[in-house]
């Protein structure tokens, strides 16, 4: 069981679900290690977005409110930081401030940036998992330490009936190491 293969398997499984769509940077064009995990997805389910993280998560929330289950891809935690407004003030709180009228479910995919074979410097390798667990009340954060966690975690995020959103945190270095 390999880390990358389990990610590809999970993405392939999610891609078979009629209400899922995948959005972010480098989902249709090569550019990150995550791109290759989407190679089995129907191209019509892939939405390439510009580098505008706050906008991306806002669009993801909108799709979820419309009945889709978006898999919103932020290749590194350091990029997801830029969507913190949408994450903390909207996705995490919308059920409360809408008096339970709205409870969108978004699957957020991010990673701790890889350091090997080339170290991209500190602005690309942050791990903010614990900080976001403290900030978020209705969005769960799951760090994927081992290959055998991956498929079940993505399946759980998709199948959960409580309409909670989930952030799944991958390790960029493990794509080739585990």
Regions found by a protein language model. Give the residues of each.
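Thiamine diphosphate
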Residues: 1-178
